[in-house]
């Protein structure tokens, strides 16, 4: 039976940092803005969860609906001394999302989506990494999982998980050997089975089965899928969990740590802003 890499104590640790910072503030913290355009039901649910979490922490979260000139609206948020973080809710309907994201300042890009922040991960500059990628690293650190010299296979090549996570794992001092797989990868099962650490970010329920994993492997399940009315990951948890050394659950794993990382990024951005006031 594998060790459960539970995300709850990791998130709790991060929220404790944030609460300590808030408790020491001499003034009201800046706002977090959720910038959206005709959000669908799943996006609304996600936005509501961020608003709720902000309320629990004592952080004001404001929803801003895109108008006729979203790029100019983002630039105004960049200049606002009352806003420390902006989340651009994907997808932005009837809007050039790349243009809007590129207009956001690096300092307020708490999701690590701007070209500047993504580039900073590659060059080793201080920047905000996409929270899901950072959440994976935070879980591994919390449970003392060393990646040095380990073979890591990441299934998924998105700019929110696969690509930035590979850069974080390749950093000097982390020193993983990383393979990124995708829909065109040949011999996928072979590459997954030989991995010391597997990260699945495919978005397909039950994609990873027990036949695909090694006995001593560590499984990080980034997937969030709705299956038979339940939230499940990419990994067939019931089958795979007894076969591996350690595994993250879904829900209760990477997802809840991702939200905590978002608010940590907001805290960092707020500290910079308050220092300039």
Swiss-Prot record:
Query: What GO molecular function terms would the record report?
Result: methenyltetrahydrofolate cyclohydrolase activity; methylenetetrahydrofolate dehydrogenase (NADP+) activity
Gene3D superfamilies documented for this protein: Leucine Dehydrogenase, chain A, domain 1, NAD(P)-binding Rossmann-like Domain
- SUPFAM superfamilies in the record: Aminoacid dehydrogenase-like, N-terminal domain, NAD(P)-binding Rossmann-fold domains
> What positions does the entry give for NADP(+) binding?
156-158, 183, 224
Its EC number(s) = 1.5.1.5, 3.5.4.9
Which reactions does this protein catalyse? (6R)-5,10-methylene-5,6,7,8-tetrahydrofolate + NADP(+) = (6R)-5,10-methenyltetrahydrofolate + NADPH; (6R)-5,10-methenyltetrahydrofolate + H2O = (6R)-10-formyltetrahydrofolate + H(+)
> Which Pfam family is one of those matched by this entry?
THF_DHG_CYH_C
- GO cellular-component terms in the record? cytosol
- What GO terms describe the biological role, i.e. biological process, of this protein? L-histidine biosynthetic process; methionine biosynthetic process; purine nucleotide biosynthetic process; tetrahydrofolate interconversion
Q: Which pathway does the database say it acts in?
A: One-carbon metabolism; tetrahydrofolate interconversion
Ordered alphabetically, the record's keywords are:
Amino-acid biosynthesis, Histidine biosynthesis, Hydrolase, Methionine biosynthesis, Multifunctional enzyme, NADP, One-carbon metabolism, Oxidoreductase, Purine biosynthesis
Main function = Catalyzes the oxidation of 5,10-methylenetetrahydrofolate to 5,10-methenyltetrahydrofolate and then the hydrolysis of 5,10-methenyltetrahydrofolate to 10-formyltetrahydrofolate.
Protein family (similarity comment): Belongs to the tetrahydrofolate dehydrogenase/cyclohydrolase family.
**Subunit structure, as described in the record:** Homodimer.
* Protein name per the record: Bifunctional protein FolD
Instruction: Tell me what organism the protein belongs to.
Output: Kosmotoga olearia (strain ATCC BAA-1733 / DSM 21960 / TBF 19.5.1)
Lineage here is: Bacteria, Thermotogati, Thermotogota, Thermotogae, Kosmotogales
Q: Which gene is the coding source of this polypeptide chain?
A: folD
